[in-house]
Swiss-Prot record:
Residues 28-53, 221-273 are annotated as: Disordered. GO terms for biological process: cytoplasmic translation. This is Large ribosomal subunit protein uL2. Belongs to the universal ribosomal protein uL2 family. Residues 39-48 have a biased composition (Low complexity). Gene3D superfamilies: 2.30.30.30, Nucleic acid-binding proteins, Ribosomal protein L2, domain 3. One of the primary rRNA binding proteins. Required for association of the 30S and 50S subunits to form the 70S ribosome, for tRNA binding and peptide bond formation. It has been suggested to have peptidyltransferase activity; this is somewhat controversial. Makes several contacts with the 16S rRNA in the 70S ribosome. The keyword Ribosomal protein applies. It comes from Salmonella arizonae (strain ATCC BAA-731 / CDC346-86 / RSK2980). Keywords: Ribonucleoprotein, Ribosomal protein, RNA-binding, rRNA-binding. The lineage of its organism: Bacteria, Pseudomonadati, Pseudomonadota, Gammaproteobacteria, Enterobacterales. Pfam families: Ribosomal_L2, Ribosomal_L2_C.
Length: 273
């Protein structure tokens, strides 16, 4: 994998930095594991904008990724690594010994021809999935379940991982990349190693159009708007003279947004600033 800085042949190419991985499959994805993925444009079923700055972008097909990794005791061979437009991580197409194929998140160091396995008897090596009660304390893992059998939810982005720092009875304590310490049931599964494609964070789009290709629309500052459009709008100068708020008047910049008190007891330490 190489990080390539483009030559300044035009203003739009001058600042582009891209990640090139010659190991990625150059053909089409495995058709039985692909389904249609319609864009919402940030609108809900009433047609109202629920998430700003979303719209347009290249059409994408959704790759069905196996986050549960519940095919126990059957070894699988990695056939190829693939690009996935729906996530920052790459994915791997694996062939199980019984003939079934599945997509999984590609961990760091995984390559075509490697063998992986799931279940309590799986070896402690990158790419294998086990319940966390069977994984040594201190190990780095990814694709971590929050409820047994639900499928991995934590640490799925490129280059991310979670560290198991303690095991106490029915729970294990995890240290997330944000600094948060959290308890999860020991029967929850996790995949050993960290997610691959860590160089994703080094890429530079280089121009606004590259963001539009990805379905990202412009973000306009509130101070650049009129008073009818935003609480920060209007005025002769650049100051808006009040505490920063969202377009709907809700305090921003530091205001707590977490409301799920039911699971507060599982958070040992809040994330570091």
């Amino acid at each position: 994998m190489a990080v390539v800085k483009c030559k300044p042949t035009s203003p739009g190419r001058r600042h582009v930095v891209k990640v090139v991985n010659p190991e990625l499959h150059k053909g089409k994805p495995f058709a039985p594991l692909v389904e249609k993925n319609s864009k919402s444009g940030g609108r809900n079923n009433n047609g109202r904008i629920t998430t700003r700055h979303i719209g347009g972008g290249h059409k994408q097909a959704y790759r069905i990724v196996d986050f549960k990794r519940n095919k126990d005791g059957i070894p699988a061979v990695v056939e190829r690594l693939e690009y996935d437009p729906n996530r920052s991580a790459n994915i791997a197409l694996v062939l199980y010994k019984d003939g079934e194929r599945r997509y999984i998140l590609a961990p760091k160091g995984l390559k075509a021809g490697d063998q992986i396995q799931s279940g309590v008897d799986a070896a402690i090596k990158a790419g294998n999935t086990l319940p966390m009660r069977n994984i040594p304390v201190g190990s780095t893992v990814h694709n971590v379940e929050m409820k047994p059998g639900k499928g991995g939810q934590l640490a799925r982005s490129a280059g991310t991982y979670v560290q198991i720092v303690a095991r106490d009875g029915a729970y294990v304590t995890l240290r997330l990349r944000s600094g948060e310490m959290r308890k999860v049931e020991a029967d929850c599964r996790a995949t050993l190693g960290e997610v691959g494609n860590a160089e994703h964070m080094l890429r530079v789009l280089g121009k606004a159009g590259a963001a539009r290709w990805r379905g990202v629309r412009p973000t306009v500052r509130g101070t650049a708007m009129n008073p009818v459009d935003h609480p920060h709008g209007g005025g002769e100068g650049r100051n808006f003279g009040k505490h920063p708020v969202t377009p709907w008047g809700v305090q921003t910049k530091g205001k707590k947004t977490r409301s799920n008190k039911r699971t507060d007891k599982f958070i040992v330490r809040r994330r570091s600033k």
